[in-house]
Amino acid sequence: VIAIQVWEYSNSLHFCANACHDVHPEEIPAYEDSYHSNVKCVECHMGRVGTLNNIILKASHFKHLPAVIFDSYERPLESETMRPANESCELCHYPPAFHGDGVRHITRFGTDEQNTQKDTYLLMKTGAGTEEEGQGFDIHWHVSSEVEYIATDEHDEEIAWVRITLPDGRTVEYNDVTEPLMPEEINEAETKTMDCVDCHNRVGHPFPPPEDLVDRAMADGRLNPALPYAKQLMLDLISASYGSEEEALEAIEEVKVQYAAAYPEIATQYPNELEAAAEVAEDLAAQLIFEDPEVSWEDFPDHNKHKDFAGCFRCHDGKHLTDDGESIRLHCNICHSVPANVGGEEPPPAVPLGPLDEPDYHLETNFIADHRFQAD
């Protein structure tokens, strides 16, 4: 009975967070802020494997004990390997399942005095499914098809070579023409098969950029846009370098006093909102300030988007070409519709639900690059 209880405890969040991974305390709040906060650590990091395999995997981690004991581990802490998606992600998220298009509404605010609101509407084409069902396209095509790649860096941010295997067995290879790999280099390099975490690499421990966190706080009402320059001040506060969390809290309190002095009417009219803004600043600072001052959210690239990191553009950049000069498709409407932007007080725009009526040359793989030069 005791052995069973010890085993169950070794699979708990409390054990992982305190006994082992207190070495990187920021990972735990990030995990709790993720969509997978009700999924046990071991289900992703060990995979849903049998008990014997789980014991072997855990035993292999004893090699990290000296680094923990002598405080000599690397920062930021990185996982050398992740369990394959078919032992973790795919046991909940079945690749052949088809997902219909979904409407995304993104609210952002300006850094001007009025915190001008801008709403973006677009259709996300998640897709997937199987070729036999007449599907197997859009974003999740990448995991319902066989896609291999070679990265030249340890974070998979620099993709040098890509190979796809077509349903009929034929293969198509794309090489980065700016720094092409030679055939012998391709043969010797580690080739990886694309799976869920090649895009969703921060799904369990997200470290969003400061601007995204502030926009979210303003959109959900925690930070009132009626406070002049609220976004800019918040960004200045949470993006500054602090020696400790206590130092950040002191800076927040000082700015709150200065703000009330600069805008006495606002402080009188919105006293509760001003206090709430200080609380938001404290929460965001705690989320963004790392124990090691040399580490920040920028050390944790998120491949799921392409605003703050290369993400999709690691491959869809117009530079990966076949021997015939065909590129990996680079279009504004492959994964989502063309974004429609409106002001905060304007009604939502009409977003087309079906395919656009485009001329044939819009579908050419090099269209975006050619269009840019033609427009210039």
Q: Where are the language model's segments positioned?
A:
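Short sequence/structural segments immediately N-terminal
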Residues: 1-376
